[in-house]
Amino acid sequence: MAKNAMLCLLILRVVLALAFATNKKGDEEPENHSTGIFGKVGRVVTVALAMSSRLGGADATRGGGAVYGGNLKSNQLPNNNWMAPPPPMAMRSAKVYDSKHSPAEYLKKFAQDFRRKTGMHSQRHHEETTLEQEKRVAGAGPDPIHHQDTTLEQEKRAVPAGPDPKHHEETTLEQEKRVAGAGPDPIHHQDTTLEQEKRAVPAGPDPTHHEETTLEQEKRAVPAGPDPKHHEETTFEQEKRGAPAGPDPIHH
């Protein structure tokens, strides 16, 4: 503050000296002497005050900073053993992917890890499962209808009672005998021979089913003998053996 006052007085002295120096030149006009002096003094004082206020503001700003710094120094603790704050930790940048792998490989690896942790699998993974994989997953074995290319032996292992004969139309007669204890249906196999049907049906085959059977075969099948009308080409001796009273004269 003392410096500011000294500066203001110095400025005021210089201004007054200039004012009186200019007033000496105007001594020829005494009527305007007072007016000129006071007007010039007023202007000089106004300029001096403006300059002093501007300089005082700048000094106050510098002084305020010094006072603030002094206050900071005075606020420090007298104890020098206080713990210093820890240094700031270095922030590690988050790695989006490893430098050795490309972003596509990193995303693929991340997806695999996510599926392994959550137990999720893609649709392609399920479509690629084979029959052996399904057997391991399901203890009872796969569904035979689901795998239409399964063989007869695979279905026997899956179903204890054996496969359905209708499901495998190419099964042979021997395979059906093993599946069904009573034997196959004679009508189902049109190409079965007479000997095969005798083994399948104890009473023997139906004579009507085999029209090409001979007279001897029909005698073995029917104890009473064949019908004479059924064999029109029988001879006279054959009819005698068939009818004890002899043949009908009208018939021959």
From Swiss-Prot:
Required for secretion from the host cytoplasm to the host apoplasm: annotated span: 21-83
UniProt-listed GO biological process terms: cell differentiation
Superkingdom field: Eukaryota
Assigned GO CC terms: extracellular region; host cell cytoplasm; host extracellular space
A- repeat segments: 127-135, 148-156, 169-177, 190-198, 211-219, 232-240
Glycosylation: residue positions: 32
Record keywords, A-Z: Apoplast, Differentiation, Glycoprotein, Host cytoplasm, Repeat, Secreted, Signal
Region (6 X approximate repeat A): 127-219
Tissue specificity comment: Highly expressed exclusively within the dorsal esophageal gland cell during syncytium formation in host plants.
Region span, Disordered: 116-252
Record's compositionally biased regions (Basic and acidic residues): 125-137, 144-179, 186-200, 207-242
CLE- repeat locations: 136-147, 157-168, 178-189, 199-210, 220-231, 241-252
Molecular function as annotated in GO: receptor serine/threonine kinase binding
Cystine residue pairs: none
Keyword field contains DNA damage: no
Secretion signal, residue range per the UniProt entry: 1-21
UniProt subcellular location: Secreted; Host cytoplasm; Host extracellular space; Secreted, Extracellular space, Apoplast
Chief location bin: secreted
InterPro entries referenced in this protein's UniProt entry, alphabetically: CLV3/ESR
Function: Mimics host plant CLE extracellular signal peptides that regulate cell fate. May play a role in the differentiation or division of feeding cells (syncytia) induced in plant roots during infection.
Protein name per Swiss-Prot or TrEMBL: CLAVATA3/ESR (CLE)-related protein 4A-2
Gene name in the database record: CLE-4A-2
